[in-house]
Amino acid sequence: MEEQIDILNPDGTPAGYSCGRTRVHAEGLWHRTVHIWVFDGKGRILFQLRSHLKENNPNLLDTSCAGHISAGDTGKNAAIRELREELGLDKSPEDLEYLFEATHENVLNGGSYIDNEYYDTYRTSVTDEEAARLVPQPGEVDDFKWMTVEEFLSMHAKNPEKFVEHPKDYGWLAGL
């Protein structure tokens, strides 16, 4: 069965129903997601290279990890699930630092994929051992790239088309 997602009103309040993610994106229904930024002991940031098979934003660098919050779930639980699925990383709720909420509106693929989301942003850290054991989820993530804040800012300034655009996230990173 397709993942069910709680629907929101445009103001972020619960709409009182859930539906499958295909309908969510076909109709542009507002919903909740999570973004998780992973840092290593050297202060570098993990970016994922989205799979070339992805329907939206294939082959672009993106947040370390992200995903939908399933119906009835919490942001922290979704973040823990996505870290495990996309990176092979096991973390506990105490390992996640909540940063902020933001909204994202985007129309892709000639209007067939509409993404209207409220997202919770988290930060976590990994040891060198954890970083060495990261495993990209087939079909979701093709590779990883570690960058310092300075490297990211330089690369993003020169080649913004290589990144999924997340202005609030990138503004936060620039302030580190």
Regions from the PLM with identified roles:
Residues 22, 59, 71, 100-105, ...:
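Nudix hydrolase/Nudix homology domain
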Residues 21-24, 62-67:
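Short helix/strand-bridging catalytic loops that position acidic/His residues to coordinate divalent metals
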